[in-house]
From Swiss-Prot:
InterPro entries found in the cross-reference section: RidA_CS, RutC-like_sf, YjgF/YER057c/UK114, YoaB-like
Name of the protein this chain belongs to: RutC family protein HI_1627
Signal sequence, renumbered to the chain: none
Assigned protein family: Belongs to the RutC family.
Pfam families: Ribonuc_L-PSP
Length: 116
């Protein structure tokens, strides 16, 4: 059994690949933490795009997305950014839940599984 770890640190790997499935760690905003949920979501989706490219994949290969929102009042902003970004020909399954995130500045965290 071979597992490939992408961008590992002492705590986690950003992506773990096994049997052509890529399991992503939760992606969170880095540069937009003082901005609204729309901007944070756009940044996080951009980070996901970069990681997908790093493993030779793209958003049309996303199987599922789990989205954690700090406050459901931001659901419309999240959906606006998502709808601008998602591959409308091959949209993944998706769940969105409200959750207390690890950093109080984060409004969104996204976890995906994709093929590669």
């Amino acid at each position: 059994m071979t597992i490939q770890r992408i961008l590992p640190s002492a705590r986690l790997s950003e992506v773990s690949i096994h049997n052509n499935l890529a399991y992503f760690a939760g992606q969170v905003p880095e540069l937009t933490i003082e901005q609204n949920a729309y901007e944070q979501t756009k940044e996080v989706l951009g980070l996901i795009d970069k990681l997908l490219a790093k493993i030779g994949s793209n958003k049309s290969n996303i199987l599922t997305a789990q989205i954690f929102l700090a406050d459901m009042k931001d659901y419309a902003q999240l959906n606006q950014a998502w709808d601008e970004w998602v591959d409308h020909v091959s949209p993944p399954s998706r769940a969105t839940v409200e959750a207390k995130l690890a950093d109080p500045h984060w409004k969104v965290e996204i976890v995906i599984i994709a093929t590669c």
